[in-house]
Amino acid sequence: MAEAGAGLSETVTETTVTVTTEPENRSLTIKLRKRKPEKKVEWTSDTVDNEHMGRRSSKCCCIYEKPRAFGESSTESDEEEEEGCGHTHCVRGHRKGRRRATLGPTPTTPPQPPDPSQPPPGPMQH
């Protein structure tokens, strides 16, 4: 029986596969752009076309509406804006914000000559 097993042969085949991948030489370029400013002039529907050229413009000093925080009511400051800045060019008829009487002489009051007994005004001090 020892002779029966001697005639068998076994073949072992080893296959080695070597896969070589070349590193990809890709490059990624990211370009940074400056943000566009969010500030811009927006005219409301009641802005006057005072030049009749199809463009909206305003010489009213109080047309600007300050941006409000989220949830802040837009009616809180409407009373002040509608009552006024006191300028004659203002088409909204504002009247409230007149400060000329407290700041000094009005344009209708002639300027007062300097008092000779007083020293001339010096440099402004802060």
From Swiss-Prot:
Residue ranges with Pro residues bias: 107-126
GO biological process, one term: defense response to Gram-positive bacterium
Effect seen on changing H87A: Loss of function in inducing TLR2 degradation
Mutation effect (H94A): Loss of function in inducing TLR2 degradation
Record keywords, A-Z: Acetylation, Phosphoprotein, Protein phosphatase inhibitor, Transferase, Ubl conjugation, Ubl conjugation pathway
Biased composition range(s): Basic residues: 89-101
Record's GO cellular component terms: cytoplasm; nucleus
Disordered: annotated segments: 1-25, 70-126
Pfam family membership, one: PPI_Ypi1
Organism in which the protein naturally occurs: Homo sapiens
Annotated tissue distribution: Widely expressed.
MF annotations from Gene Ontology: phosphatase binding; protein phosphatase 1 binding; protein phosphatase inhibitor activity; protein serine/threonine phosphatase inhibitor activity; ubiquitin protein ligase activity
Residues modified to Phosphoserine: S73, S74, S77
Enzyme class name: transferase
Effect of H52A: Loss of function in inducing TLR2 degradation
Protein encoded by which gene: PPP1R11
Residue ranges of the region described as Atypical RING finger domain 2: 85-94
Associated pathway: Protein modification; protein ubiquitination
Reaction(s) the record says it catalyses: S-ubiquitinyl-[E2 ubiquitin-conjugating enzyme]-L-cysteine + [acceptor protein]-L-lysine = [E2 ubiquitin-conjugating enzyme]-L-cysteine + N(6)-ubiquitinyl-[acceptor protein]-L-lysine
Residues with the Phosphothreonine modification: T75, T109
Protein name per UniProt: E3 ubiquitin-protein ligase PPP1R11
Atypical RING finger domain 1, as annotated region: 52-62
Keyword DNA repair: no
Subunit structure: Interacts with TLR2 and UBE2D2.
Residue spans of biased composition, Low complexity class: 10-22
Residues with PTM N-acetylalanine: A2
InterPro entries: PPI_Ypi1 (IPR011107)
